[in-house]
C-alpha cells in the first residue's frame, strides 16, 4: 500500500482521527508512532502517465518491491539487496530516507531500432542502512513502460572495494504467469567446450516455475505473460566492472533471482562473483511492462540509462556484407573463393565481405593482404574473423591467440589498420564472468584506437553496448543461421524461431543472425544438405525483421542466377540501419508484423509460423489513402510475387501471409 501522508495512513489502519480524553492519548500516541514508522518504511514511484507503478517497503528489515500496471499485479513482493564480503545488505536493513526526481533526456543513437529517443522517467532513490550502519542507495527509474533499478554504494570509511557474493534481487511473478525462456547452458559443454553461448532453444507459454533444462536457470532477456500484461526482464550497463547475470530457476511460487555465472565457466578460471571499487554501482536491471507487446518490441531502456564510454576514433559506416562460410563452409576459406565473394559483394553493391575462420592457415597473411587490395579495388571493405580464446576452450580455428591479451591484440589490430580492414568478427567466448566482460571491453576499446568495428559471435547478449561502445556492431547470442546448415530440425523450426526473436532476443540489442538464405538446399551447389522450409519472401522479410547494423547475408554467387530476380533486386536495396521501429501485430512463436523506417522509406514486414494462411488487417498510418506501395507476397503455391498495392484505407490494409511465408510492403 502507498499513502500520501500520515493522516491517510492513520485512518487506513485505525478508521478515523478522533479527539480523546487525556487517558487514552498515550495509547493513540503509541499507535501513531507505529503508524509513522510504517509510513517511513514505504515508498512508491510511477511512470509519467501513472499506469506503471512500483511500491517499495521493508518487510521485517528485508527490502522488497512490487509492480503493477493499470492496477494489475505484474510482480508480487520481490526481494532486493545483496550479501557482500563487507556486510549483508539484504536483511536487518533500516530506512534512512527517500528522494524523488525526474529524468528527461533526448539523444540520438545509431545502430539501434530508432535514431532519436525521448526518455522521460520518474526517479526514486531509497537510502537504507544495514545492521553495521553502512548505507545503500537503491535507485529506481520508471518511464511509461520501463523500470530500471540498481544499487549504488559509497566508500565505507577506508574500505574502498567489495565483492558481491550473492544478490537477493528477485522477480516474483504470479502463479498464473506463463513464460518464454531460453535455458542457461552448463559450462564447458557443446562444440569444443565453448558454451554457454546463448544458443539454446526457447520454450513458449510454459508454466511459471518450470525447471530449466540444465538446472542453471534462464538467460536474459526473459519474456513473461502475466494475465492481461506482458513483462520483459533483462539487464544493461554491464562492462568490465561486473559480471553478466541471468535468472535462477524459480521457486515453486514463481520467484526468479539474479544468478551469477557458474564457477566452471572459462575452464574454471576467474571469479564468478563480481568485485567493485567503491564508490560503485551494479548494472541496471530492467523490466519492460505493457498491456500488449508493443512496448516490449519497441523498448529502448537498454540504452536510456547508459552513456557512451568513449568517443569514436572515426565515423564508422554500417551496411551489408557477403560471407562465404555460411553456405560453402570451411572449404571456401581459400584465396580463389574469397575473390568470388568479394565479386558478389561488388555486384550486389554491398559495403563489406567477411573472411571467416581458417584464413591464417589456408590463405596466409601475405595473400590476405592481396585480398584486401583486390576488395578495395572493387569498392568493398573487409571484416576478418578471429578466435577469442586463450585458455578457456578448445576451438581450433585460426587466427588464434591474437585477441586474448593486449600485446598480441594491439599488434594484430595495427596490421589490420595498415591493410585497410574495417572490422573484426571475434568468436568463442563462452562465459559471463567479470573477467570475460573485461575482455569484451578490452577488444572494443583497443579496436576503436585502430578504427575497427567489432562483431561478437559465440558470445553473451549485448547489454546497452550500442550506446556504450561506438564501434560495437553486433552480437550473435542466438540460435543463428549456421544451425540451418547443420541440422534439419532448425530448418523445420525456422519460422517459429523467427516469430520469437522480435519479441525476446532482438528487443534488447543487435542480433547478428547471418540470415536471408536464398538457396533452396543448404549446400554449395544448392542440391543437397538441409532443406529450407520457408518461402523466398519470408527470407527477404527477415532482412528487415532482424535488426543489426552490419548484416552478413547468407547469399551465394549462384543466387545471382538461380534466385528470383525480384529477390536479388530487393536485397540490393535493403538498408541495415533504422530511424524508427513500430510493432504492428503478432504473438511470440506464431506470427510477427512490424514496420521500420530508413530515412523517408518505410518497410512493413510480416512472417507467419503457423500452418494456415494468416489474414490480417493492418493499421498503416505512414501511408495515405490513394498511395501505391510495392507489395511482396507469396502466392498459394508459395512462389514470390511483386505487386503494386493501392492503399484504400490506411487503417485497414488487408494482407495474407502464407504458412512459413512472409510479406513486405514498402515505399
Task: List where the protein language model places each region.
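Bacterial Sec-dependent N-terminal signal peptides
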Residues: 1-42
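N-terminal accessory beta-strand-rich subdomains and adjacent acidic, glycine-rich linkers
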Residues: 42-298, 302, 639
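Glycan-recognition and catalytic regions of carbohydrate-active enzymes
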Residues: 126, 555-603, 607, 637-643
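Conserved, mostly hydrophobic/aromatic
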Residues: 151, 345, 427, 454, ...
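An acidic-aromatic substrate-binding cleft motif
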Residues: 277-352
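Aromatic- and carboxylate-enriched substrate-binding clefts and catalytic-loop regions
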Residues: 354-535
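Carbohydrate-binding surface patches
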Residues: 587-625, 663-666
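C-terminal beta-strand-rich structural cap/linker in extracellular carbohydrate-active enzymes
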Residues: 645-667
Amino acid at each position: 500500500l502507498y499513502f500520501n501522508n500520515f493522516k491517510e495512513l492513520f485512518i487506513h489502519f485505525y478508521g478515523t482521527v478522533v479527539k480523546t480524553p487525556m487517558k487514552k492519548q498515550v495509547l493513540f500516541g503509541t499507535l501513531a508512532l507505529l503508524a509513522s514508522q510504517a509510513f517511513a518504511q514505504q515508498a512508491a514511484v510511477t511512470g509519467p502517465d501513472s499506469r506503471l507503478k512500483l511500491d517499495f517497503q521493508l518487510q521485517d528489515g528485508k527490502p522488497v518491491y512490487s509492480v503493477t500496471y493499470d492496477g494489475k499485479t505484474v510482480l508480487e513482493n520481490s526481494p532486493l539487496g545483496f550479501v557482500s564480503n563487507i556486510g549483508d545488505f539484504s536483511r536487518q536493513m533500516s530506512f534512512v530516507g527517500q528522494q524523488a526526481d525526474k529524468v528527461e533526456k533526448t539523444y540520438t543513437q545509431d545502430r539501434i531500432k530508432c535514431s532519436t529517443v525521448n526518455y522521460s522517467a520518474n526517479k526514486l532513490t531509497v537510502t537504507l542502512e544495514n545492521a553495521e550502519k553502512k548505507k545503500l542507495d537503491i535507485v529506481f527509474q520508471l518511464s511509461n513502460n520501463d523500470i530500471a533499478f540498481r544499487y549504488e554504494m559509497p566508500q565505507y570509511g577506508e574500505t574502498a572495494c567489495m565483492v558481491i557474493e550473492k544478490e537477493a534481487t528477485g522477480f516474483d511473478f504470479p502463479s498464473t504467469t506463463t513464460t518464454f525462456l531460453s535455458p542457461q547452458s552448463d559450462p564447458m559443454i557443446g562444440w569444443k567446450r565453448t558454451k554457454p553461448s546463448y544458443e539454446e532453444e526457447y520454450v513458449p507459454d510454459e508454466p511459471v516455475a518450470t525447471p530449466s533444462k540444465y538446472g542453471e536457470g534462464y538467460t536474459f532477456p526473459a519474456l513473461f505473460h502475466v494475465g492481461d500484461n506482458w513483462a520483459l526482464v533483462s539487464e544493461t550497463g554491464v562492462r568490465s566492472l561486473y559480471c553478466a547475470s541471468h535468472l535462477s530457476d524459480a521457486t515453486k511460487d514463481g520467484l526468479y533471482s539474479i544468478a551469477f555465472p557458474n564457477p566452471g565457466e572459462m575452464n574454471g578460471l576467474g571469479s564468478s562473483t563480481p568485485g567493485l571499487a567503491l564508490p560503485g554501482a551494479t548494472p541496471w536491471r530492467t523490466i519492460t511492462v505493457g498491456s500488449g507487446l508493443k512496448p516490449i518490441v519497441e523498448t529502448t531502456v537498454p540504452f536510456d540509462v547508459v552513456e557512451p564510454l568513449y568517443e569514436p576514433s572515426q565515423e564508422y559506416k554500417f551496411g551489408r556484407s557477403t560471407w562465404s562460410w555460411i553456405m560453402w563452409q570451411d572449404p571456401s576459406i581459400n584465396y580463389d573463393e574469397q575473390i568470388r565473394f568479394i565479386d558478389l559483394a561488388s555486384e550486389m553493391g554491398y559495403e563489406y565481405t567477411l573472411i571467416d575462420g581458417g584464413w591464417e592457415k589456408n590463405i596466409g597473411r601475405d595473400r590476405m593482404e592481396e585480398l584486401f587490395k583486390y576488395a578495395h579495388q572493387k569498392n568493398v571493405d573487409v571484416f576478418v574473423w578471429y578466435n577469442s580464446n586463450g585458455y578457456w576452450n578448445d576451438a581450433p580455428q585460426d587466427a588464434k591467440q591474437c585477441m586474448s591479451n593486449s600485446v598480441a591484440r594491439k599488434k594484430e589490430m595495427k596490421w589490420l589498420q595498415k591493410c585497410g580492414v574495417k572490422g573484426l568478427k571475434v568468436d568463442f567466448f563462452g562465459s559471463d564472468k567479470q573477467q570475460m566482460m573485461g575482455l569484451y571491453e578490452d577488444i572494443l576499446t583497443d579496436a576503436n584506437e585502430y578504427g575497427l568495428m567489432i562483431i561478437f559471435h559465440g558470445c553473451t547478449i549485448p547489454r546497452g553496448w550500442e550506446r556504450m561502445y561506438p564501434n560495437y556492431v553486433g552480437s550473435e547470442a542466438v540460435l543463428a543461421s549456421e544451425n540451418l546448415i547443420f541440422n534439419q530440425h532448425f530448418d523445420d523450426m525456422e519460422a517459429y524461431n523467427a516469430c520469437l526473436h522480435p519479441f525476446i532476443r532482438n528487443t534488447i540489442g543487435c542480433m547478428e543472425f547471418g540470415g536471408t538464405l536464398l538457396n533452396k538446399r543448404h549446400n554449395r551447389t544448392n542440391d543437397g544438405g538441409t532443406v529450407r522450409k520457408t518461402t523466398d519472401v519470408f527470407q527477404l522479410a527477415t532482412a528487415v525483421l532482424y535488426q543489426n547494423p552490419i548484416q552478413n547475408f547468407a547469399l551465394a554467387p549462384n543466387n545471382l542466377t538461380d534466385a528470383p530476380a525480384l529477390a536479388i533486386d530487393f536485397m540490393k536495396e535493403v538498408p541495415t540501419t533504422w530511424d524508427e521501429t513500430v510493432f504492428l501485430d503478432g504473438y511470440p512463436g506464431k506470427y510477427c508484423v512490424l514496420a521500420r523506417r530508413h530515412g523517408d522509406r518505410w518497410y512493413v514486414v510480416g512472417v507467419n509460423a503457423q500452418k494456415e494462411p494468416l489474414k490480417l488487417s493492418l493499421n498503416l498510418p505512414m501511408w495515405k489513402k490513394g498511395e501505391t506501395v510495392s507489395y511482396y507476397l507469396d502466392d498459394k503455391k508459395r512462389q514470390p510475387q511483386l505487386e503494386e498495392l493501392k492503399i484504400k484505407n490506411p487503417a485497414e490494409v488487408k494482407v495474407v501471409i502464407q504458412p512459413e511465408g512472409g510479406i513486405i510492403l514498402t515505399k
